[in-house]
Amino acid sequence: MAIEFPKSSHQSGLRFMNRNPHPKKERHGDCGVRAICLAFDLDYDKVWKRATSNKRNNAPVYCYSDGTGSHYYERSKATATWGLSKDDLIETLQDFNLDVVYKKTAYKEQGRNVQMYFNAGNLPDRCIAHIPRHWVAVRDGAIWDTWDSRGKRPRKLRGYVCLRSDL
């Protein structure tokens, strides 16, 4: 069911809904996990565990030498607490059987790069927007996040992740 809001006075055309799905209401760099939970109504702990697993599997394996000729290989101990890459985020959504696609919004026109902006007219009704250094859930004409990432000036939109059926 779509929620109806009055028209936003913000330059992005989006409203801000302050939401934090973290069980302890902590605020740190888990924006990818928060965005997945808020955009697709999934449980935070399940998403965090799956995203952490994907992040570790996609990370490089480190090789150490102790100086005696022995080599030790170690996998990354990174967690989803400090951000997700585009591949980690998409793989996590696919693990929940969501048929998603990343739509890049930059393109070349007459030899120069053209970048779209984080604006209601450039996004589908439900998606995860990729803005510089951040993922944010967009649903029903509003951003759903722990802080107002719309900004005072127009922000570049790198791309967005949405269901293939929403394209």
Regions found by a protein language model. Give the residues of each.
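Conserved active-site-adjacent core of cysteine acyl-enzyme catalytic domains
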Residues: 59-133, 139-148
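Functionally constrained cores in energy, signaling, and assembly domains
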Residues: 39, 137, 158
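Generic detection of intrinsically disordered/low-complexity segments and helix-coil linkers/edges
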Residues: 8-10, 111, 154
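Noncatalytic regulatory segments and standalone regulatory/sensor domains
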Residues: 145-167
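Short glycine-aromatic motifs
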Residues: 14, 98-100, 127, 154-157
